[in-house]
């Protein structure tokens, strides 16, 4: 018996089982990575696939279907135009600044200069806030006082403003303001003017005394403005009976002689 007599079955290639060209083809269907051509080759990490971007969120729509107004839509026409004009001007200025920035142009833009001048004029026309350090002399009533009429207007304004302080504190008004103020104001006056001031104050004193006396006596019945107790009440007068009970006409009931004899006319 020889080896030639034995029959061997030789497997033939089919379309379903293609021939393996390389070792890598054999492991293509495996989960393992393909074999490297050399053991010394560096392993290149695989790039991870970027996740797909999520679709943008759809814009919110009003459930009621109503149009949502912006803040600028609620303004009146004039204000809205001013805001739009200002926004357009700012946009132009920003574009011009970005354009000329690279060119090294240091000159101020005409619109920017006009806007700055307008703001400066508005700041000058705006009245300054009053503080404790604001000098009274800068007020026109002081700085423009020249004629007698101007001084009278100044007096009326000062008297109204200062006299109103008495309502806050009468004690401080008299002790810390009015008395010392009268003295300080009277210092530049001449002696004759001070005497006139004293006479005016004396008249005021008498007027205040009269008012206080009237107010006090108004609470008492029968009082007078001069401080008296008033007129006394007149006593009731006795009725005049025509002298019927005078002494010379008195008669006695015991003397009946006149009534004793009635004469012939006596019916008894």
Curated annotation (Swiss-Prot):
Stretches the record annotates as Disordered: 1-27, 40-63, 217-249
Stated name of the protein: Eukaryotic translation initiation factor 3 subunit J
Cellular localization per UniProt: Cytoplasm
PANTHER family, alphabetized: EUKARYOTIC TRANSLATION INITIATION FACTOR 3 SUBUNIT J
Keywords: Coiled coil, Cytoplasm, Initiation factor, Protein biosynthesis
Pfam families: eIF3_subunit
MF annotations from Gene Ontology: translation initiation factor activity
Positions in coiled-coil regions: 191-221
Main location: cytoplasm
Gene3D superfamilies reported in the protein's UniProt record: Eukaryotic translation initiation factor 3 like domains (1.10.246.60)
């Amino acid at each position: 018996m020889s080896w030639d007599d034995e029959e061997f079955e030789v497997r033939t290639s089919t379309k379903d089982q293609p021939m393996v060209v390389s070792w890598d083809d054999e492991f293509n269907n495996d989960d393992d990575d393909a074999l490297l051509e050399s053991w010394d080759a560096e392993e290149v990490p695989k790039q991870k696939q970027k996740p797909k971007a999520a679709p943008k969120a759809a814009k919110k729509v009003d459930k009621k279907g109503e149009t949502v107004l912006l803040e600028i839509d609620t303004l009146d026409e004039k204000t809205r135009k001013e805001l739009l004009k200002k926004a357009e001007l700012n946009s132009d200025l920003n574009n011009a600044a970005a354009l000329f920035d690279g060119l090294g142009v240091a000159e101020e833009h005409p619109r920017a200069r006009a806007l700055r001048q307008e703001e400066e004029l508005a700041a000058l026309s705006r009245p300054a806030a009053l503080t404790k350090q604001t000098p009274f002399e800068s007020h026109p009533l002081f700085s423009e006082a020249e004629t007698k009429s101007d001084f009278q207007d100044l007096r009326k304004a000062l008297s109204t403003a200062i006299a109103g302080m008495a309502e806050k504190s009468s004690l401080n008004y008299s002790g810390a303001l009015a008395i010392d103020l009268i003295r300080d104001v009277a210092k530049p006056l001449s002696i004759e003017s001070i005497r006139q001031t004293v006479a005016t104050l004396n008249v005021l004193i008498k007027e205040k005394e009269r008012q206080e006396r009237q107010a006090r006596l108004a609470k008492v019945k029968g009082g007078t403005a001069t401080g008296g107790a008033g007129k006394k009440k007149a006593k009731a007068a006795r009725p005049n009976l025509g002298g019927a009970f005078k002494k010379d006409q008195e008669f006695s009931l015991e003397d009946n002689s006149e009534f004793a004899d009635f004469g012939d006319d006596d019916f008894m």
